[in-house]
């Protein structure tokens, strides 16, 4: 494929994304402020020293950062604008890490950028109307749906055994 994939946060999900991407022949880079460089490189992934370096190096960036006070709105105009022409931002983290207003502004200015997310952003209607063909989202985190909370189904089990 010849593309460079950047993994922003090299936890369990990031590691598995790297493992799968290797099968597509992608060159894989990762940045994680809390994961030692040696751990990343042991997996055959190139560790970079900053988020800025990751975004400026990679054609595709896959987000896996947690939503914390420090990361809220951290994926912003300045950071995403570092991506090469034709860049794709994939958010499988939390929608709160994206500064939606700044991403909309950037995508208006840079018609080469694309954005995919597995959780519908608050500004979904704006993204969908303005960026058809460059934006995709699913309505919510996908996965099994239970009719009631798991705790109400599992906790009573011992009394029925």
Locate the predicted segments by residue.
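Residues at the starts of beta-strands that form the adenosine-phosphate
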Residues: 26-27
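Conserved acidic E/D residue at the C-terminus of a beta-strand in Rossmann-like folds
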Residues: 32
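Alpha-helical scaffold segments in soluble metabolic enzymes
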Residues: 12, 16, 60, 102, ...
